[in-house]
UniProtKB/Swiss-Prot annotation:
Keywords: ATP-binding, Cell membrane, Cell projection, Cytoplasm, Helicase, Hydrolase, Inflammasome, Membrane, Nucleotide-binding, Nucleus, RNA-binding. Residues 645-654 have a biased composition (Low complexity). The keyword tRNA processing does not apply. Multifunctional ATP-dependent RNA helicase. The ATPase activity can be stimulated by various ribo-and deoxynucleic acids indicative for a relaxed substrate specificity. In vitro can unwind partially double-stranded DNA with a preference for 5'-single-stranded DNA overhangs. Involved in many cellular processes, which do not necessarily require its ATPase/helicase catalytic activities. Involved in the regulation of transcription and translation initiation. Involved in innate immunity. Involved in both stress and inflammatory responses. This is Putative ATP-dependent RNA helicase an3. The lineage of its organism: Eukaryota, Metazoa, Chordata, Craniata, Vertebrata. The gene is an3. Disruption phenotype: Morpholino knockdown of the protein causes anteriorization of embryos, that exhibit enlarged heads and eyes, shortened tails and defective melanocyte and eye pigmentation. The keyword Cell membrane applies.
Length: 697
């Protein structure tokens, strides 16, 4: 019995010896080093594995480190889904093959070897995402290849970023952010398929531009007049921007020269690209700087704080997402990764997105403060600060949060960082804020400050409250079926009620206001933009910054209580050189804005109804005894750089003799709806005999 056992042991020893399991030299080449078990199906491949680069890009020590052993009960590299999510079963959707420079949908190709694993931490794997099989709620058109970070890249400055969605083929150029990465037809189609140009640029260029400040850089006439690098110029071409708008002609060289800027331009004038283009071009030229070194030394996955190089603050989530989408376009084929955070969305998902890396952050003030207090965002290395729609942020009560972000945290002080403020209006309060935030800034006024575009024909109609719905139906019936109409109301309840009324009247419509979920708001905007619901009922939440092209008609069903809100509402039409119409329902509830509305109509060379002139005259006499301040639109404080006194330096970027007259700027309009503008108030007859219709045709 024992003899048989001993014999069996000897036979086993002989069998193990035959398998050469204990030969350290055979495997490691180092005497005295204990060998490791090699599965039978891999023994013949071991010698040639390094020559074939099977584990290229995985940064591991061979098969065991490059790919997780199934014995630990976790998914291995082949089980991970094509979007980096574990076990999602999407691995056959296609991967980018670095060696073949194309999309590779084969399961047995080396594209899998670029997926990192537990053994890759700190070894520079190129593509990996932890637990993100679901798409982010705010990346509506984003796919899994569009810029995900990786676990091993603690800094977030990896070679694969959301804004560019590209592999970096040349590792020697890894630190050169100015060189574009490889193109990708699919992402290119996704980002640049829409139209971005207006139809009336010849007249649009006639708008005068005034730049005030010391040593103001000369303006440009073409994007080629200033050096912005290969990446930016390529993306400008893809975006089909043929030439800069007036605000871009002046703002881009000012920002390139690293000057602070306070710019006032009409809505829809290209303000977003005016600051994104020069900021991104400087980031590409300078690289990440100290931010990457700091993150590499101190970052830990899941707990690290992100340090964006640029911060853009916006008042609403819609505007923040819109700026973010533009940033994605201009960050295409670069190493810069844009991110966006805003209230009303899952903060956990936004934190996970930030942890994958963030170089340019677009945020609403409230959510950014939340992220900073959670230790997820640090502004220590922020070189560029942008306040977009600054007056609107103050109107919404964000000044404490803005001052907390800019003055009471770790953001570099003015003079060290570069700060830009953009808005359609700049009343005195905003200019005082600019004095605190900006350093030796240049004041840029495109057109008249606080004015409206002459591409917009403005009509003010006296309509009693009980007649508003009937009058609205008449306007909608006179509008072409393919025309987009934006109807503004004052309250959320009013928006829902009006949408319900129009729906039961047979009109395809949708609505958007603050009580709607983010998903509902995005869906409503999509339905409106696509023309499926050509009527959008909205509160002021949609009035600022939304770039909805081809809006033919804006209707103020309820006029706002202040004239600046009126400017922003009607600015939704006539954008970037297009022509539009704005109709406002006026009655005794709106007397408080009579004088300002009259001044605005006169300034924009619009026809003024006689009843409005009479009301403004009466209102002026009533308020004179109370010492009423000068009108917002009568050339007062907000209409120029308040630093100007006698002899202040200024330069005029355009010597043309004034703005274009736009669409029907001074023509009569008593037309298809009869005489609305007689002194008796609402003029009744919808079937006027004039040959000029409501649209000025």
């Amino acid at each position: 019995m024992s003899h048989v056992a001993v014999e069996n042991v000897l036979n086993l020893d002989q069998q193990f010896a035959g398998l050469d399991l204990n030969s350290a030299d055979a495997e490691s080449g180092v005497a005295g080093t204990k060998g490791r078990y090699i599965p039978p199906h891999l023994r013949n491949k071991e010698a040639s594995r390094n020559d074939s680069n099977w584990d290229s890009g995985r940064g591991g020590n061979g098969y065991i480190n490059g790919m997780q052993d199934d014995r630990d009960g976790r998914m291995n590299g082949y089980d991970r889904g094509g979007y980096g999510s574990r076990g999602t079963g999407r691995s056959d959707r296609g991967f980018y093959d670095r060696e073949n420079s194309g999309w590779n949908s084969g399961r047995d190709k080396d594209a899998y070897s670029s997926f990192g694993s537990r053994g890759d931490r700190g070894k520079g794997s190129l593509f990996n995402e932890r637990g993100s099989g679901s798409r982010r709620t705010d990346d509506r058109r984003q796919d899994g290849f569009d810029g995900m970070g990786n676990r091993s890249d603690k800094s977030g400055f990896g070679r694969f970023d959301r804004g560019n969605s590209r592999w970096s083929d040349d590792r020697n150029d890894e630190d050169d952010w100015s060189k574009p990465l490889a193109p990708n037809d699919r992402v290119e189609q996704e980002l640049f398929s829409g139209s971005n140009t207006g139809i009336n640029f010849e007249k649009y260029d006639d708008i005068p531009v005034e730049a005030t400040g010391s040593n103001c850089p000369p303006h440009i006439e073409s994007f080629h007049d200033v050096t912005m690098g290969e990446i930016i110029m390529g993306n400008i071409q893809l975006t089909r921007y043929t030439r800069p708008t007036p605000v871009q002609k002046h703002a881009i060289p000012i920002i390139i020269e690293k000057r602070d800027l306070m710019a006032c331009a009409q809505t829809g004038s290209g303000k977003t690209a005016a600051f994104l283009l020069p900021i991104l071009s400087q980031i590409y030229a300078d690289g990440p700087g100290d931010a990457m070194k700091h993150l590499q030394e101190n970052g830990r996955y899941g707990r690290r704080k992100q340090f964006p190089l640029s911060l853009v603050l916006a008042p609403t989530r819609e505007l923040a997402v819109q700026i973010y989408e533009e940033a994605r376009k201009f960050a295409y084929r670069s190493r810069v990764r844009p991110c966006v955070v805003y209230g009303g969305a899952d903060i956990g998902q936004q934190i996970r997105d930030l942890e994958r890396g963030c170089h340019l952050l677009v945020a609403t003030p409230g959510r950014l403060v939340d992220m900073m207090e959670r230790g997820k965002i640090g502004l220590d290395f922020c070189k560029y600060l942008v306040l977009d729609e600054a007056d609107r942020m103050l109107d919404m009560g964000f000044e404490p949060q803005i001052r907390r972000i800019v003055e009471q945290d770790t953001m570099p002080p003015k003079g060290v960082r570069q700060t830009m403020m953009f808005s359609a209006t700049f009343p005195k309060e905003i200019q005082i804020l600019a004095r605190d935030f900006l350093d030796e800034y240049i004041f840029l006024a495109v057109g008249r400050v606080g004015s409206t575009s002459e591409n917009i024909t403005q009509k003010v109609v006296w309509v009693e409250e009980m007649d508003k719905r009937s009058f609205l139906l008449d306007l909608l019936n006179a509008t072409g079926k393919d025309s987009l109409t934006l109807v503004f109301v004052e309250t959320k309840k009013g928006a829902d009620a009006l949408e319900d009324f129009l729906y039961h009247e047979g009109y395809a419509c949708t609505s958007i206001h603050g009580d709607r979920s983010q998903r509902d708001r995005e869906e409503a905007l999509h339905q409106f933009r696509s023309g499926k619901s050509p009527i959008l009922v909205a509160t002021a939440v949609a009035a600022r910054g939304l770039d909805i092209s081809n809006v033919k008609h804006v209707i103020n069903f309820d006029l706002p209580s202040d004239i600046e809100e009126y400017v922003h509402r009607i600015g939704r039409t006539g954008r970037v050189g297009n022509l539009g119409l704005a109709t406002s329902f006026f009655n005794e509830k709106n007397i408080n804005i009579t004088k300002d509305l009259l001044d605005l109509l006169v300034e924009a060379k619009q026809e003024v109804p006689s009843w409005l002139e009479n009301m403004a005259y009466e209102q002026h006499h009533k308020s004179s005894s109370r010492g009423r301040s000068k009108s917002r639109f009568s050339g007062g404080f907000g209409a120029k750089d308040y630093r100007q006194s006698s002899g202040a330096g200024s330069s005029f970027g355009s010597s043309r003799g004034g703005r274009s007259s736009g669409h029907g700027g001074s023509r009569g309009f008593g037309g298809g709806y009869g005489g609305f503008y007689n002194s008796d108030g609402y003029g009744g007859n919808y079937g006027g005999s004039s040959q000029v219709d409501w649209w000025g045709n």
